[in-house]
Amino acid sequence: MINLRKTHPLMKIINHSFIDLPAXSNISAWWNFGSSLGVCLMIQISTGLFLAMHYTSDTLTAFSSVAHICRDVNYGWIIRNLHANGASMFFMCLFLHIGRGIYYGSYLYKETWNIGVILLLTVMATAFVGYVLPWGQMSFWGATMVTNLLSAIPYIGTTLAEWIWGGFSVDKATLTRFFAFHFILPFIIMALVIVHLLFLQETGSNNPSGINPDSDKIPFHPYYTIKDALGLMFLLLVLLSLALFSPDLLGDPDNFSPANPLNTPPHIKPEWYFLFAYAILRSIPNKLGGVLALLASILILLVIPFLHTANQRSMMFRPISQTLFWILTANLITLTWIGGQPVEQPSIIIGQLASILYFTLILVLMPLAGMFENYMLEPKW
């Protein structure tokens, strides 16, 4: 009997990608986040589709249409809560996935890593335009503040900002186009995910030890499908707990008020997953300098593969690099906290020091640690 799974043109691709895929036998739970991100994307697209059926992208009715979804649409409240908190879960998995890549040296698969960074930027853009759609106070002022950063670009800045707005300020045209962007971007993300996986198939997955695992491979199914299923259960448990028990925990109270261009909130801040970059932006007094630092805080991921100086790929057996990695993690948590604080002392100086430390760790200390560890491993007799 012919095995359709291995012969059918379409099934064959799925089989080689998810069933008979040779996987390293020692990959840990840190490798679960790729599949978790895939499920997050599916949840976001499916809940988003149902929300788009009832949402109206008009400044007069956007806020009330979201209220209508929660009050009058059948199960609208759970769809909206899953979508809003699903974004937080998405970014949580993204940050852990990137952290794992840095810790275990997965960034040395340069093509996969670079597509991953492009994916991160696309997801951030999608989340930003999505946050504007409910047209609450923080939606409106967040959109005004972030799009206004474009005006810091010399010569073309103001023209560019007005082109994005579709007028002289954030208004109806802006909301309509942001809804269009928010609808199309997840499908672009899906295409990029396929490219990300294609590049990963070329090299095979990395593993905690960082050494070539070709001599010891096992099939992806059933070993890692079961393991991923456990990770997905945890993901869904946290997501459902958030959506059902405290759906507004990660939101901003200001967004319960309709957008009012005449009333500025006392403290404009983005969602929690952008706060680290927002803190870096705020730590530089100059507008253009802040925008460049904001971009650098994300694009620095692209230079990490070129800063790898250690002879070993993974940090598993490199205690100095491990220490620096966990300092970087603590530093990012500090930046996230500072980004949510009002602009006053001591928050300003803490933010500036944490921003300097962020770039110093990645650009200077981690490459130096790799070189020092190489020296320590050299035989001295």
Swiss-Prot record:
GO terms for biological process: mitochondrial electron transport, ubiquinol to cytochrome c. Heme b b562 binds at residues 83, 182. Binds 2 heme b groups non-covalently. Disulfide bonds: none annotated. It is found in: Mitochondrion inner membrane. InterPro entries: Cyt_b/b6_C (IPR005798), Cyt_b/b6_C_sf (IPR036150), Cyt_b/b6_N (IPR005797), Cytb/b6-like_sf (IPR027387), Cytochrome_b (IPR030689), Cytochrome_b_C_euk/bac (IPR048260), Cytochrome_b_N_euk/bac (IPR048259), Di-haem_cyt_TM (IPR016174). GO terms for cellular component: mitochondrial inner membrane; respiratory chain complex III. PROSITE patterns: CYTB_CTER, CYTB_NTER. SUPFAM superfamilies: a domain/subunit of cytochrome bc1 complex (Ubiquinol-cytochrome c reductase), Transmembrane di-heme cytochromes. It holds the Pfam family Cytochrom_B_C. One of its GO terms (molecular function) is metal ion binding. It is a multi-pass membrane protein. Its cofactor is heme b. Coiled coil: none annotated. Heme b b566 binds at residues 97, 196. It comes from the Eukaryota. The chain crosses the membrane at residues 33-53, 77-98, 113-133, 178-198, 226-246, 288-308, 320-340, 347-367. The keyword Transcription does not apply. Belongs to the cytochrome b family. The cytochrome bc1 complex contains 11 subunits: 3 respiratory subunits (MT-CYB, CYC1 and UQCRFS1), 2 core proteins (UQCRC1 and UQCRC2) and 6 low-molecular weight proteins (UQCRH/QCR6, UQCRB/QCR7, UQCRQ/QCR8, UQCR10/QCR9, UQCR11/QCR10 and a cleavage product of UQCRFS1). This cytochrome bc1 complex then forms a dimer. Component of the ubiquinol-cytochrome c reductase complex (complex III or cytochrome b-c1 complex) that is part of the mitochondrial respiratory chain. The b-c1 complex mediates electron transfer from ubiquinol to cytochrome c. Contributes to the generation of a proton gradient across the mitochondrial membrane that is then used for ATP synthesis. This is Cytochrome b. It comes from Sminthopsis hirtipes.
